[in-house]
Design a protein with these regions (language model features):
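Intrinsically disordered, low-complexity regulatory segments that flank or precede the catalytic domain
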Residues: 1-62
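Activation-segment/catalytic-loop signature of the eukaryotic protein kinase fold
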Residues: 133
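Conserved N-lobe beta3->alphaC-helix segment of eukaryotic protein kinase catalytic domains
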Residues: 97-122
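Conserved short submotifs of the Hanks-type protein kinase catalytic core
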Residues: 138-151, 155
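Activation segment signature within eukaryotic-like protein kinase domains
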Residues: 170-171
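Conserved N-lobe ATP-binding subsite of Hanks-type protein kinase domains
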Residues: 80
């Protein structure tokens, strides 16, 4: 049933394509090593408006022969991910291989171009690192951080739902990652368990920036994402394509949906019919089970607010009583605890 409710929304009036509807097969074994290359300094991503001709700053920096290709880690609609080892120093990474013909046929060249541009310019311990990329006549390859414990969604399927302690720690890390992105004027626009990976130490890694966008003016009108996680303003755009513009608060709504799904085990607005799911979203029609604590329920209700500007801010999420209860120890702040927990795991 879980796979059946995770539909990727498509619309002829929006820049959305079908994507995977079931968990990827991800490995749980080898530990990542430290990357020996020199990282680029973090910079504001520039807006992308050109078709996909991926230009490398130094085309000779990377090539397929540099890597020993290992077992498959996952397969999506348009790409495959493999465990790979850099031949010179043994550095383990994930190599995402995209085929140009498939990208062109699906008309998502700009999406991939934007993903590369944005993800290569962000540096945060809770965001999956893109070390570099290269291409040949047939393929575009992304060199990604290897998240050894795989997909959050796979773990959620296995456990059914998470404890509130685990959920709160994941949500706190997500809030820190989103705060970092929003300060750089980046909207992720596709937050869901399938797009969150888990590192070797249990820290989360926000991934899949295919629908993300750099938007300094903070107003957009393109519908994209996954139906269960769409905000009310995006649903309104589906019905009246030119009537609404939205900003980064759509990520706050998605964070609320994620919080609910982690502690309950399914999205809050699920219905067997998509039209009813849309209706429930536009009315914020949800029922929080009695086993959910009052603190968790309060945070969910403060994020899943119909009026975008009334949703809890990321700062309010980070200092919410539910987060403090499960993340704070020895009177330190939640930020200090989680910063210490991730500082030793981030790559230099």
């Amino acid at each position: 049933m879980r796979n059946a409710i995770r539909r990727q929304w498509t619309s002829s009036s929006s820049q959305v394509a079908k994507r995977k509807t079931k968990p990827r097969t991800l490995a749980n074994n080898p530990s990542p090593c430290s990357f020996s290359g020199t990282p680029h300094e973090a910079a504001e991503p520039s807006r992308i408006s050109t078709p996909l001709v991926v230009e490398l700053s130094d085309p000779k920096s990377f090539h397929l022969g540099m890597f020993e290709i290992g077992r498959p880690l996952g397969k999506g609609m348009l790409g495959r991910v493999y465990l790979a080892r850099e031949r010179t120093n043994g550095f383990l990474c994930a190599l995402k291989v995209l085929y140009k013909k498939e990208l062109q046929e699906s008309r998502i060249e700009e999406q991939v171009h934007r993903e590369i541009e944005i993800q290569s310019n962000v540096r945060h311990p809770n965001i999956l690192r893109l070390y570099g990329h290269f291409q040949d006549s047939q393929r575009v390859c992304l060199i990604l951080e290897f998240a050894a414990k795989g997909e959050l969604y796979r773990q959620l399927v296995k456990e059914g739902r998470f404890s509130e302690r685990k959920s709160a720690r994941y949500i706190a890390q997500m809030a820190f990652a989103l705060d970092y992105l929003h300060r750089k004027h980046i909207m992720h626009r596709d937050i869901k368990p399938e797009n969150i990976l888990i590192g070797i130490h249990g820290e989360i890694k926000l991934s899949d920036f295919g629908w993300s966008v750099y938007s300094p003016n903070r107003r957009r009108n393109t519908v994209c994402g996954t139906l269960q996680y769409l905000s009310p303003e995006l649903i309104q755009l589906l019905e009246q394509p030119t009537s609404v513009r939205y900003d980064e608060t759509i990520d706050l709504w998605s964070l609320g949906v994620l919080t609910y799904e982690l502690v309950v085990g399914q999205p809050p607005f699920f219905d067997t019919q998509d039209c009813m799911t849309q209706k429930r979203i536009t009315q914020a029609d949800m029922t929080v089970p009695s086993f959910v604590s009052p603190e968790a329920k309060d945070l969910i209700q403060k994020l899943l607010v119909l009026e975008p500007k009334r949703r809890a801010s990321l700062k309010e999420v980070q200092t919410h009583s539910w987060i403090i209860k499960h993340c704070v120890e020895n009177h330190n702040t939640a930020r200090e605890i989680l910063s210490n927990a991730t500082s030793n795991k981030s790559l230099n």
